[in-house]
From Swiss-Prot:
Protein source organism: Paracidovorax citrulli (strain AAC00-1) (Acidovorax citrulli)
Binding site for Zn(2+) 1: 70, 72, 85, 88
Gene Ontology biological process terms, A to Z: DNA-templated transcription
Purpose of the protein: DNA-dependent RNA polymerase catalyzes the transcription of DNA into RNA using the four ribonucleoside triphosphates as substrates.
Binding positions for Mg(2+) per the UniProt entry: 458, 460, 462
Record lineage: Bacteria, Pseudomonadati, Pseudomonadota, Betaproteobacteria, Burkholderiales
Coiled-coil ranges (or none): none
KW Mitochondrion (keyword) present: no
InterPro entries noted in UniProt: DNA-dir_RpoC_beta_prime, DNA-dir_RpoC_beta_prime_bact, RNA_pol_asu, RNA_pol_N, RNA_pol_Rpb1_1, RNA_pol_Rpb1_3, RNA_pol_Rpb1_3_sf, RNA_pol_Rpb1_4
Stretches the record annotates as Disordered: 1384-1411
Protein name as annotated: DNA-directed RNA polymerase subunit beta'
Membership in a protein family: Belongs to the RNA polymerase beta' chain family.
Self-association and partners: The RNAP catalytic core consists of 2 alpha, 1 beta, 1 beta' and 1 omega subunit. When a sigma factor is associated with the core the holoenzyme is formed, which can initiate transcription.
Amino acid sequence: MKSLLDLFKQFTPDEHFDAIRIGMASPEKIRSWSFGEVKKPETINYRTFKPERDGLFCAKIFGPIKDYECLCGKYKRLKHRGVICEKCGVEVTQTKVRRERMGHIDLAAPCAHIWFLKSLPSRLGLVLDMTLRDIERVLYFEAYVVTDPGMTPLKKFGIMSEDDHDAKRKEYGDEFIAKMGAEGIKDLLEGIDIDLEIEKLRGDLTGSEVKVKKNAKRLKVLEAFKKSGIKPEWMVLDVLPVLPPDLRPLVPLDGGRFATSDLNDLYRRVINRNSRLRRLLELKAPEIIARNEKRMLQEAVDSLLDNGRRGKAMTGANKRALKSLADMIKGKSGRFRQNLLGKRVDYSGRSVITVGPTLKLHQCGLPKLMALELFKPFIFSRLEQMGIATTIKAAKKEVESGTPVVWDILEEVIKEHPVMLNRAPTLHRLGIQAFEPILIEGKAIQLHPLVCAAFNADFDGDQMAVHVPLSVEAQMEARTLMLASNNVLFPASGEPSIVPSQDVVLGLYHATRDKINGKGEGLVFADTGEVQRALDAGQVELHAKISVRLTEWTKDKASGEFVPSTSLVDTTVGRALLSEILPKGLPFSNINKALKKKEISKLINVSFRKCGLKETVVFADKLLQNGFRLATRAGFSVAIDDMLVPPQKTEILARAEAEVKEIEQQYVSGLVTAGERYNKVVDIWGKAGDDVSKVMMDQLKVEKTTDRHGKEVNQESFNAIYMMADSGARGSAAQIRQLAGMRGLMAKPDGSIIETPITANFREGLNVLQYFISTHGARKGLADTALKTANSGYLTRRLVDVTQDLVVTEEDCGTTNGSVMRAIVEGGEVIESLRERVLGRSTAEEVLHPETRAVLVPAGQMLDEDTLEELEAAGVDEVKVRTALTCETRYGLCAKCYGRDLGRGGLINLGEAVGVIAAQSIGEPGTQLTMRTFHIGGAASRAAIASTVEAKSNGVIGFNATMRYVTNSKGELVVIARSGEVIIQDEHGRERERHKVPYGATLTVKADQQVKAGTILANWDPLTRPIITEFAGQVKFENIEEGLTVAKQVDDVTGLSTLVVIDPKRRGSAKVVRPQVKLVDANGAEVKIPGTDHSVTIGFQVGALIQVRDGQDVGPGEVLARIPVEGQKTRDITGGLPRVAELFEARSPKDKGMLAEITGTVSFGKETKGKVRLQITDPDGKVWDELVPKEKNVLVHEGQVVNKGELIVDGPADPQDILRLLGIEELSRYIVDEVQDVYRLQGVKINDKHIEVIVRQMLRRVVVENPGESGYIAGEQVERSEILNTNEQLQSEGKIPATYSNVLLGITKASLSTDSFISAASFQETTRVLTEAAIMGKRDELRGLKENVIVGRLIPAGTGLAYHQARKAKEAMDDAERRAIAEAEAAEMATTGSDEAPEVEGSGVESGSAE
């Protein structure tokens, strides 16, 4: 009876497991899984379609073909369940057991598992300490291996060829045992004493680095075997498991042919070869034949496990490689990525989208037919409830006939039932949002215009998918978390995502502009109603300046009530009418200006902060409706006459032509080199283009009009094109410049700039040549888009993979660490203010008033807009805030360190998957940036080179600590510091701006000088880098020999010659010398550096043009040589995306700069061929030296004092060096700034937090330096949380903890080295990850999101985190309860011996509360 009852139990998958372990199966284990041995290669009988007995599809082994029916048909139906038919041997049960029952094949000869042999590093090789080549020779029967040397001088593990073996046999007879094939290897593996080996190796971790490394590797593998209890000999198979037949199906096609899984072919080969080998062994066939068969069997097993890993892949009849077991799980179309991480789902549909301007923000229009199909089950159940249909079949009929009652039910079912809309590619979480469906006629989904920005959707044929959340929980989550009206901010930056665009912006902008002397100017109105009547009557026009009495509502801080205040406001008609839609609590001043796109965005942001979510959504909807209406009423049009070509254009072009001619002249007379000429020409044209566009915009911007007094005045233009660009609705100054200015410089396909620009614009029209030049850019744009979209997607995938397990797991980790934030100032401009950087972060320590030292903000408080206003008022210029990097939570992050949830506006909630959000925020713009290249049409967007710096504000000049300069003969101050900066301070001594000044620049200000804004502080030649002398003297050339170190360049045009330093590789002699200049004084003695006995030596690097003659007198600050700077390539995100990937992969840049390893004094040691020896001596006299290639530019000179981590050889910094020398905080700052630079160039806002989260994940592993009394090996990489836990335990036991140093891993490396093998295997290199995990017998704790998705549990984030925590708490309680009951029972039995069951009180209550 019990078994019958089991039938009705719903089969529930047991998801209450908390970890998964992977290991290697022993032969006993494989046999215990198996339901029988597969002896024959036959599959199914092609006539009867019944499986052959003992074959690959045998029903006796694997289970019946039809539910509850044996093969011969003797037993049918449920009553016989569990009976085994005596005729055909088949158990009567469900067919689905054919998906889970395995078989096995007993191999006649052992076979090595190819993964452990060939997946590098070869595990077999490590365990046996043999080379892969040797093991392969043994396994594939090319050589013998000695398994037992006996009394002979042969070595165990020794390899010998066939001939050697024969000779040794003759010599020693049967004294020794040597074997071939997997048997030999198996014997060796069985003979290994793991404990002994480990002890030997532990004692042997000394000696040369190579040896230590090798031993450590072996040690690791052996310890893994020991820990996991796996025996090494299991790497060689005696029994091969056979996959259940329904997982490798064989389907009859019509026409008597079969479609089969490749695995069946591979299994057939193994079985065939195995039975043949068995027969040969029984017949005692000659050794050589049996050997060949064993080799073939080994190859067949290899192919089954991983086809193509060794030798040529086995092919089927159609010459294509067969898909082996390994291929089934790896790659994009393998099990992990195809079926476990990306499933297709039921209850979904897709259709084209069109605009739904009448919808509210939380609604979408759903076509009736789609809704009918999607909500079918709901309709069926309702039909049954109402008694209209009795069965599902009847209900189906009813729905298909489409009676009116069905449509009524559909309306009812759909009410309050949100659906989710998704637009591919889903680049961030706003790519899926929930809406309430509104039934519409037609076949297209209607989408609210305001959510288009978040979906990145437009209506040119985009399609979207609809998904129905079925369960009540799913509906609730969709409604509370995913509803479009709850997602009004971008999670990347905290900016509003529901900002109107295009026509709406144009309508609002047009309506809020003001006009001089408009009709009705100066009238005063009582209220907006009166304004509306006057406008309708034609008494005033929309742009007229008027005064209106308006009532504003402000929130009373004490009571929280809104109090009205009425006043007369000067405004325009359009703005006054727009004021009616303002939510309470938003002052009118917010819309009393021309509403451009930025202003509207700010308006929505302010509304969100001041009035809350609900009001803002309503307000945004109203703005949208009004914008559409106003844009329609405005009657915009664009005519060719709106593109005004400036009359000054011809004059500017003529001037540029003249300048170019002059440069050509200078080139001809040899004053400039070819490279300089090109650079200067490109610069002239770049400037000319900018000038044209400036005068064009100036002309478009204003128009003349007469005011009330009849005077002619300028006012902002109402030109349609100008208004579109100015409002931010469509187009930009760059595009208008191409329409009405000049197209300007174009780039060649390789990115270099063509020096003749296109002087025409689109209004004038291009000639054939100009058109041809511009096709380069357009095509490059299209090609780039295609390539880079893929790259960007891959970057996002790697980012998500490295951060997917980072979730907010606790409120506060209690750390006091943090990082100090200041405003970012570059080139004198504040790029990012302090406010933008610290908004929404928590303070790490108290913020004090700079003057009174009063506490403004306590530690651990989140900084919001209001607090920051107070800080700004107090003049605070730096704040120490908590960051994701300094958070001390073990698994995950704490809410305090993360700060504000940018997508919601409050402190982040527990369970928020901040890792994935960070990855999406960085990856999403990547794709957009990549698609942005060709909009400019390849017009070369070359950054105009700066050649001066000017003060932006008034103040006092100061210089930074490293600034040094000399005064030259003209009395100018010449900078000779590599990292000099000019600082301007205000009257309180607070730094206002800071400018980098390059080496060789001329300073035009002195220290402590008062300057006004606009003063030029320094200037320099941007196209060359000078080499300057600091001291006076007479030039004495050394090693400057023509043909050896310098070449005379004679210009073919001018006949003039200059000396150019040439590359040492091209010099004739072997002795390498560095061309340099020494200075001698009047007496011929060498000039020394003051305070030392080093003589002044100035070296020239390759490519320098020497400007002085031997014996010439020079003064300080004079230029000895110039190095031309190569022409810049156009800056495009092309440089950007790879740059971001390079930073996150932590690659060492090529030609990287060198940082000083220690603090000390620089000197140059003995040179070698092609290299300079650079030495730094620290105060204790410790010397660090390094050889630097001569072509590198050394930034330091003899006797200079450098600090640890300072750049001493020019080039990009290596993040690994920064981490090693300057620490985590500097590294984080470097990566954040570099990544932000790339995005900022494209005008993309991303919060620093997201980048920090990624950096935290890149730093999550550490290298053990001194293992102490832990079980680690020095040099081993461990998860940071793991070593912290171990150390805590060691310290509590009074043992010596391990010491470790930080290590920076690239994102790919970090994803692969995660503790979760499931996540790593599904990312990349599946084989390697699984092999390693199997040997170590790894446990996956299922901490990350990916692992849980793969095993089909709720993810431990969001509501899932709460679910898992509650479940664990309940389990712990249940355990405690069970124990208590057991104890109580035991006590009861002991005391009374009565048989009454003890009552347990409150048990139900307790377990309920845990939920």
